[in-house]
Amino acid sequence: MAEIKVHSDVTGTAWKIVVVKGQAVDEGDELMIAEAMKMEIPHLAPESGVVKEICVDEGAAISEDDLLFIIET
């Protein structure tokens, strides 16, 4: 099984995490919503798989390229 690492596209806040560890996701499913400059930016699953690890806490500050999730395919 391969691991896909999902990184942040923006600097802001991990406003809402919408998945839990162990949850199956399909390509394009929403994993998290980040807030940056009063805008909500969704982070989507790049491939189908299972959420192996959530690497950020809800409400935490995030920077561009921070590791957010690991998905096992």
Regions found by a protein language model. Give the residues of each.
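Short beta-strand-turn/beta-hairpin segments enriched in glycine/proline and small hydrophobics
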Residues: M1-T13, E30-S48, T73
